[in-house]
Swiss-Prot record:
<keyword id="KW-0616">Plasmid partition</keyword>
<feature type="region of interest" description="Disordered">
    <location>
        <begin position="1"/>
        <end position="20"/>
    </location>
</feature>
<protein>
    <recommendedName>
        <fullName>Protein SopB</fullName>
    </recommendedName>
</protein>
<dbReference type="GO" id="GO:0003677">
    <property type="term" value="F:DNA binding"/>
</dbReference>
<keyword id="KW-0614">Plasmid</keyword>
<dbReference type="GO" id="GO:0030541">
    <property type="term" value="P:plasmid partitioning"/>
</dbReference>
<dbReference type="Pfam" id="PF18090">
    <property type="entry name" value="SoPB_HTH"/>
</dbReference>
<dbReference type="Pfam" id="PF02195">
    <property type="entry name" value="ParBc"/>
</dbReference>
<feature type="compositionally biased region" description="Polar residues">
    <location>
        <begin position="11"/>
        <end position="20"/>
    </location>
</feature>
<dbReference type="InterPro" id="IPR036086">
    <property type="entry name" value="ParB/Sulfiredoxin_sf"/>
</dbReference>
<comment type="function">
    <text>Control of plasmid partitioning; required to recognize the cis-acting. Binds specifically with the DNA segment containing the sopC region. SopB is trans-acting.</text>
</comment>
<feature type="DNA-binding region" description="H-T-H motif">
    <location>
        <begin position="180"/>
        <end position="199"/>
    </location>
</feature>
<dbReference type="InterPro" id="IPR040873">
    <property type="entry name" value="SoPB_HTH"/>
</dbReference>
<comment type="similarity">
    <text>Belongs to the ParB family.</text>
</comment>
<dbReference type="InterPro" id="IPR004437">
    <property type="entry name" value="ParB/RepB/Spo0J"/>
</dbReference>
<keyword id="KW-0238">DNA-binding</keyword>
<dbReference type="InterPro" id="IPR003115">
    <property type="entry name" value="ParB/Sulfiredoxin_dom"/>
</dbReference>
């Protein structure tokens, strides 16, 4: 997790840890807890308070190549699992590859499968990197699962798109369409709720254009949804075109995605000529195109020396002969 405390690797050992309990009702993901969990090994147990009730958790370790079969994300977790791509997890994957998972997830066992309340991003990162997935498993009811899920989302907030889906569900199922009542319950303004709900109406293929869904703000999502009212098929087609460009290696900034999507609403293409785009030819080798200009960016630590020398040789041919 991007802002979660990191468990130093050197604190790990294989000595059993006796059951303990936290006397304070604070959320379990605190510094003192991280230090205690860091020394746990498979099968060790710890007792923690969740929603004011003590829960005994046992550390289980799932193999990365089977984590998606032996676990699932709890249905009450609002994070959209389909949007957890390598780009969206770029804050986790490097550390998983280097040192493995640092902070255990939380979940419960249901019919032989572990349901994850907190740790869906780490679960996907473990699957993508085929790393071990560490989960503290306890007997949890839905209230406790919801509390742990919210705790995890405090470290890596869900997007306006994901929150909008939850708001829309609550608005219909719990508040009979009364936005004011929902706003009071969520302790946020009606405007924010309305913007998030409108953002959630966008096709998922549009949200997937961004590196991670959090790049699309509620304000921008709301404006985009309103701009394409009764024009959803046009929006989907443009999103499909941009996805094809991404597959070819083009990298878009968040602002560029929105500009390119809305450009199809204009009859003239003149406004598109000055847009910039970035193409990645290989790891460490990208080119930025902007109007008539092209900017080459090479990472000498990742691009072979012979390739850089060839590029330099071509550039030297452009040098004007000395007078």
């Amino acid at each position: 997790m991007k802002r979660a405390p990191v468990i130093p690797k050197h604190t790990l050992n294989t000595q059993p840890v006796e059951d303990t309990s936290l006397s304070t009702p604070a959320a379990p993901m605190v510094d003192s807890l991280i230090a205690r969990v860091g020394v746990m090994a498979r099968g060790n147990a710890i007792t923690l308070p969740v929603c004011g009730r003590d829960v005994k958790f046992t550390l289980e370790v799932l193999r990365g190549d089977s984590v998606e079969k032996t676990s699932r994300v709890w249905s009450g977790n609002e994070r959209d699992q389909e949007l957890l791509t390598e780009d969206a997890l770029d804050d986790l994957i490097p550390s998983f590859l280097l040192t493995g998972q640092q902070t255990p997830a939380f979940g419960r066992r249901v019919s032989g499968v572990i349901e994850i309340a907190d740790g869906s991003r780490r679960r996907k990162a473990a699957a993508l990197t085929e790393s071990d997935y560490r989960v503290l498993v306890g007997e949890l009811d839905d209230e406790q699962m919801a509390a742990l899920s919210r705790l995890g989302n405090d470290y890596r907030p869900t997007s306006a798109y994901e929150r909008g889906q939850r708001y829309a569900s609550r608005l219909q199922n719990e508040f009979a369409g009364n936005i004011s009542a929902l706003a009071d319950a969520e302790n946020i303004s009606r405007k924010i709720i309305t913007r998030c709900i409108n953002t959630a109406k966008l096709p998922k293929s549009v949200v997937a254009l961004f590196s991670h869904p959090g790049e699309l703000s509620a304000r921008s999502g709301d404006a985009l949804q309103k701009a394409f009212t009764d024009k959803e098929e046009l929006l989907k087609q443009q999103a499909s075109n941009l996805h094809e460009q991404k597959k070819a290696g083009v990298i878009f900034e968040a602002e560029e995605v929105i500009t390119l999507l809305t450009s199809v609403l204009k009859t003239s293409s003149a406004s598109r000529t000055s847009l910039s785009s970035r193409h990645q030819f290989a790891p460490g080798a990208t080119v930025l195109y902007k109007g008539d200009k092209m900017v080459l960016n090479l990472d000498r630590s990742r691009v072979p020396t012979e390739c850089i020398e060839k590029i330099e040789a071509i550039l030297k041919e452009l040098e004007k002969p000395a007078p």
